[in-house]
């Protein structure tokens, strides 16, 4: 029996994120802060090449192991299914778009930096609820996931805990992007 690299985009994403965290906690202590965290409002400098890169790379950075394990428990569970349905390159594009949108919105609206793949997790959760989507129908699973996950995040974000509003914001945006991909992106080999 041999081990198969069955989900190239998701596995590469997971290994890259773990590598960034290992390096950040051992020999390159400032790696995450410098290259894998998008700055907040007032900290983004358009002339800085690094700032532009972090609009995409912040999803690879994580604060610690519980943060990474929490995100990749979902990504490694849902991601391979999505990669099978949509293909490796489209899933890579979806992850990249989610990273860019959450990064840009963080720069525009929040003063704190942003790192982690939480927006990608919520994009995948909402996108996965569209696996049985057909023209003219909205899956009940999508509605339930929307109410449960995004409703919870909205409730938390409007609470008194201002320290966590940024991550809830990334969750909400990621879920919204996943919903859009679900509505407009066709699985491989299907037509609406």
Q: What residue spans do the PLM features occupy?
A:
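A detector for small-residue-rich transmembrane helices and their helix-helix packing motifs
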Residues: 1-192
């Amino acid at each position: 029996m041999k081990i198969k690299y069955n989900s190239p985009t998701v596995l590469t994403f997971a290994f890259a994120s773990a590598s960034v965290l290992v390096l950040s906690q051992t020999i390159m202590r400032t790696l995450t802060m410098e290259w894998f965290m998008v700055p907040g409002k007032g900290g983004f400098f358009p002339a800085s090449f690094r700032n532009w890169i972090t609009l995409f790379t912040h999803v690879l950075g994580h604060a610690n192991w519980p943060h990474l394990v929490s995100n990749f428990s979902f990504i490694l569970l849902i991601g391979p299914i999505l990669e099978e349905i949509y293909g490796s390159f489209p899933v890579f594009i979806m992850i990249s778009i989610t990273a860019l949108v959450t990064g840009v919105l963080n720069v525009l609206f929040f003063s704190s930096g942003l790192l982690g793949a939480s927006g990608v997790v919520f994009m995948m959760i909402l996108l996965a609820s569209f696996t049985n989507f057909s023209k003219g129908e909205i899956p009940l699973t999508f509605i339930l996931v929307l109410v449960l996950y995004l409703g919870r995040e909205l409730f938390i974000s409007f609470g008194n805990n201002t320290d966590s509003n940024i991550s809830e914001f990334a969750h909400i945006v990621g879920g919204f992007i996943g919903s859009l991909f679900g509505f407009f992106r066709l699985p491989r080999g299907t037509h609406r």
